[in-house]
């Protein structure tokens, strides 16, 4: 009995040790402890390779032991690792991506025609049950009728964003929505242009523009300021001023004086500092403070006074910087000569001392100047006017006209252009740009459109004209017409109106033929109604037959229905939502 009682007790720890397969911690000897400490010191100094965890990453030897040691409940094998200090993947929250957003404008189309298992017994939708249905309870549910099944509601996704995702103001933005605003502004501009064109047409029809164009004062540019046309325009401008506030929209300014739409946009053509010189060895740009102290054009050989930006060092020489530097220099010189003053310790004392020094210095210069003039003379030379005023006036007589042209006297010098002028190359007798045709510039001497081509003279003109004639004959194109004057356009418009009046007279004669067309349409509609009734009867018979015994529609005719057939279909169609549907069926 005693042996039997001891065996199971002694067997229990043995089986437990086999299952755990763990070795008991052994006590380290003094030699092992010393070797371990030496190895740690070598790793800290970099003479020995660092420990590597199970993922192949190096473990920093400077990490304390209480951080790097693995607890027994995480890894009983006690392998070197820092996995227990890192965030565990199973505890990390899963956030939605930045591109996900709620769907808008989802169309709910009733596509299903058969009741589905698990759907709502009342309406037939799959997204809810009968007790959660918002539709009016039917007398006979969709489960038993199988008709008029409601569409499935669109369930929005449950989005969970992180800190940045919740504050992303552009998440879910659709750029196509902005096109609606663009179209609205385009319609407003089009309406304004049509109003302006209509007013011009009215003035043209009344003959005001023609009289103004043919008047001799208009040809010589001597128009009276208080003319009738200007009065009319001023009155129209006053009327437009009344409604300018109604026409004004955000982003626009309706200028009634000039009759144009002015965009309230600020044109900024400034260049970023780091884009002025793309050479990486040029001036250093600090992105944190957005400062570039040195001149970016220093290596380009440009004069700092000619460039628009020469670095931020100019700030050091603006404001009170120069005066403060002069005060500091005065403090150092005064301290060397025995005066105990300091810019930071005694700023008020130093400022008063420096002001008195400047006053005494100016008085000393004046006394020195007066003593020299008394001794040597020459005061009359100092009283002369400044050099800027010596050549400011002239006695040359010049007479101008009211247009600004010189009538008599010396003509003013023409402002020089920044481009090269009167440069004739490659044997040309005219400059580049002296000839223009069909949107292209060229040389007038040879009609050549290539800038660096050699001059061919009259032979080049003849060759260009012959090529144009050959191209026109081959393509059958007519030569470009000359632009018409306003008078010619007005005459063409009157001719078109006469043609329209003649067409209206012909249309009245053909009104008698329209009665016959109505009778034919009525006959076609009657035939289409009879055909539609026959089709509905055929469909009713087929629906009463079992679904598996219905015939195939393999030889069904597919063609576009006529207008009479569509009208008959609309007249015979039954609408279940119509309250008069039961009476119409009778």
Swiss-Prot record:
The gene is Slu7. Residues 1-102, 206-254, 496-586 are annotated as: Disordered. Required for pre-mRNA splicing as component of the spliceosome. Participates in the second catalytic step of pre-mRNA splicing, when the free hydroxyl group of exon I attacks the 3'-splice site to generate spliced mRNA and the excised lariat intron. Required for holding exon 1 properly in the spliceosome and for correct AG identification when more than one possible AG exists in 3'-splicing site region. May be involved in the activation of proximal AG. Probably also involved in alternative splicing regulation. GO terms for cellular component: catalytic step 2 spliceosome; cytoplasm; cytosol; nuclear speck; nucleus; small nuclear ribonucleoprotein complex; spliceosomal complex. The CCHC-type zinc finger is required to retain the protein within the nucleus and prevent its shuttle back to the cytoplasm via the CRM1 pathway. There is a cross-link at residues 349, 408 (Glycyl lysine isopeptide (Lys-Gly) (interchain with G-Cter in SUMO2)). A zinc finger (CCHC-type) spans 118-135. Residues 20-44, 519-550, 557-578 have a biased composition (Basic and acidic residues). This is Pre-mRNA-splicing factor SLU7. PANTHER family: PRE-MRNA-SPLICING FACTOR SLU7, STEP II SPLICING FACTOR SLU7. Pfam families: Slu7 (PF11708). GO terms for biological process: alternative mRNA splicing, via spliceosome; cellular response to heat; intracellular protein transport; mRNA 3'-splice site recognition; RNA splicing; RNA splicing, via transesterification reactions. GO terms for molecular function: pre-mRNA 3'-splice site binding; second spliceosomal transesterification activity; zinc ion binding. It is found in: Nucleus; Nucleus speckle; Cytoplasm. It comes from Rattus norvegicus. Keywords: Acetylation, Cytoplasm, Isopeptide bond, Metal-binding, mRNA processing, mRNA splicing, Nucleus, Phosphoprotein, Spliceosome, Ubl conjugation, Zinc, Zinc-finger. Residues 498-509 have a biased composition (Basic residues). A motif (Bipartite nuclear localization signal) lies at residues 129-169. Residues 235-248 have a biased composition (Acidic residues). Belongs to the SLU7 family. The modification N-acetylserine is found at residue 2. Its main location: nucleus. Component of pre-catalytic, catalytic and post-catalytic spliceosomes. Associates with the spliceosome prior to recognition of the 3'-splice site for step II, probably during catalysis of step I.
């Amino acid at each position: 009995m005693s042996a039997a009682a001891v065996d199971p007790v002694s067997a229990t720890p043995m089986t437990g040790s086999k299952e755990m397969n763990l070795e008991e911690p052994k006590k380290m000897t003094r030699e092992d402890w010393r070797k371990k400490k030496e190895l740690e010191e070598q790793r800290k100094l970099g003479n020995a390779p660092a420990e590597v965890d199970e993922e192949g990453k190096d473990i920093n030897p400077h990490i304390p032991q209480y951080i790097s040691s693995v607890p027994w409940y995480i890894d009983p094998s006690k392998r070197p690792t820092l996995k227990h200090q890192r965030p565990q993947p199973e505890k990390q929250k899963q956030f939605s991506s930045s591109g996900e957003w709620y769907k808008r404008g989802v169309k709910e189309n009733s596509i299903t025609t058969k009741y589905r298992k698990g759907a709502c017994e009342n309406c037939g939708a799959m997204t809810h049950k009968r007790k959660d249905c918002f539709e009016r309870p039917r007398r006979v549910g969709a489960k038993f009728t199988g008709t008029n099944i409601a569409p499935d509601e669109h369930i929005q996704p449950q989005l969970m964003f992180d800190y940045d995702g919740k504050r992303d103001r552009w998440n879910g933005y659709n750029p196509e929505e902005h096109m609606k605003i663009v179209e609205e502004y385009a319609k407003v501009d089009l309406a304004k242009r049509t109003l302006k064109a209509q007013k011009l047409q009215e003035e043209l029809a009344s003959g005001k523009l023609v009289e103004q164009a043919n008047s001799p004062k208009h040809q010589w540019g001597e128009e009276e300021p208080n003319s009738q046309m200007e009065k009319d325009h001023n009155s129209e401008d006053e009327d437009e001023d009344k409604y300018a506030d109604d026409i004004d929209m955000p982003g626009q300014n309706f200028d009634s004086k000039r009759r144009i739409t002015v965009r309230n946009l600020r044109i900024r053509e400034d260049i970023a500092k780091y884009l002025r010189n793309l050479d990486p060895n040029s001036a250093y740009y600090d992105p944190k403070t957005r400062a570039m102290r040195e001149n970016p054009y220093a290596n380009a050989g440009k004069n700092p006074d000619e460039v628009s930006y020469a670095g931020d060092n100019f700030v050091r020489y603006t404001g009170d910087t120069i005066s403060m530097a002069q005060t500091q220099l005065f403090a150092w010189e005064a301290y060397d000569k025995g005066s105990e003053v300091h810019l930071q310790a005694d700023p008020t004392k130093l400022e008063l001392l420096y002001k008195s020094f400047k006053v005494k210095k100016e008085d000393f210069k004046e006394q020195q100047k007066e003593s020299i003039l008394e001794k040597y003379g020459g005061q009359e030379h100092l009283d002369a006017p400044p050099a800027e005023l010596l050549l400011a006036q002239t006695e040359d007589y010049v007479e101008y006209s009211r247009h600004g042209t010189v009538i008599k006297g010396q003509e003013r010098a023409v402002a020089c252009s920044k481009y090269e002028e009167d440069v004739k190359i490659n044997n040309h007798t005219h400059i580049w740009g002296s000839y223009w045709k069909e949107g292209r510039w060229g040389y007038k001497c040879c009609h050549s459109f290539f800038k660096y081509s050699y001059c061919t003279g009259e032979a080049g003109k003849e060759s260009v004209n012959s090529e144009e004639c050959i191209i026109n004959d081959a393509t059958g194109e007519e030569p470009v017409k000359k632009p018409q004057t306003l008078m010619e356009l007005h005459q063409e418009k009157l001719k078109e109106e006469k043609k329209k009046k003649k067409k209206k007279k012909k249309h009245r004669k053909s009104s008698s033929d329209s009665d016959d067309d109505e009778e034919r349409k009525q006959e076609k509609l009657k035939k289409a109604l009879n055909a539609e009734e026959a089709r509905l009867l055929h469909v009713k018979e087929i629906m009463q037959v079992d679904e598996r015994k219905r015939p195939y529609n393999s030889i069904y005719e597919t063609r576009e229905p006529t207008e009479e057939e569509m009208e008959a279909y609309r007249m015979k169609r039954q609408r279940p939502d119509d309250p008069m549907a039961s009476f119409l069926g009778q």
